[in-house]
Amino acid sequence: MSISIRDGRGALRLVLCALFCLLPAACGGKEPVDDVVAGGTVILEPPSADGGGDDGIRERSLGPSPAAPAAVTPVASPAPRTTARPSAPAVAPVWQDLSRRLAADGISGPRVDALLAGLPATPTQSPMGRKIKALYNRKFFPAPPSDKPQAQYYKGVVTDANARLCRQFITANSKAFRQAEQRYGVLSSIAASLLFVETRLGKVLGDTSENAFYTLASMAVSRTPESISDWLPQLRDHERHMDWIAETMPKRADWAYKETRALVEHMLRDRVPPEHLPGSIYGAVGLCQFMPSNIATYGADGDGDGRVDLFTVPDAVASLSHYLARHGWKAGLSRERQHALLMRYNHSTVYANTIMALADRVAALK
């Protein structure tokens, strides 16, 4: 009996199926617990019912299907970086009351904090100690009257050599002196002589090593005798007059506070750093030696830069001339009236005498 090719194919399929069924047992295998098949394995599938016109054997790869894209977890955007605000400069405890007092007067902010933070941690006792010593001796131990005649001029000031220095200074700063004389009527010889008496034409700007801000701030916070403990032994019999010292010091401290406040306002308004403020023993500043409370009223911008800097010649000359003019100085005044107005600048007869005598010598050098 002949076997057709189609029948042969059917027999072959039966044999193959039997072999596949026997293989797991022969190899000691076990039924897989899931449908996972090693990647790359190829199995044979039976043909579809309709045959599909093929030989009934198809291959299907059981390799891993392409994985579905994993869900992307959104990454949180980093929090916006914040720049830490710089902390306010530390103000030493001893200046805290001064800071609060300035703030109560409307003077506060980072620039004020920076000024106060720049002060040494301990006040200087010198300015208040010196002031109390002078007042104390005048009250309790006044000097006896002297039989010697009072000097007419400051010693060594009214000389031809100094007059020449003043004339040279006027020539070197001719524009500043000319403008001040035209505007305020103060003669250049008078203005230059005043600057010579005050600061030797700007060569001697301070009597102490402390700047004016430190000097005045120290006085402003020195309100009790303990604040000048180093000076008390210099006051004869001070134990008997402690009540007077305790009563006097707050008054001087209040005066110093007003000058300190005026100086802080000047530093803020005219952009003047404290290290640019050498001063007298009680805080006068500049070539013309203004107390700070006079700067806002009488300070003048001589060079037109929009600020008052009494350590520049144009501003110093304009400011001292403005001060005298505001007190009545004008061209053509009598010598007596000029003398009286110079005493308004510094209440001293010898002071006014010296300026006028030196100015006469300067004028003679034209």
Model-based region annotation:
Residues S2-R13, F20, A25-G279, G283, ...:
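Cell-wall glycan-active module
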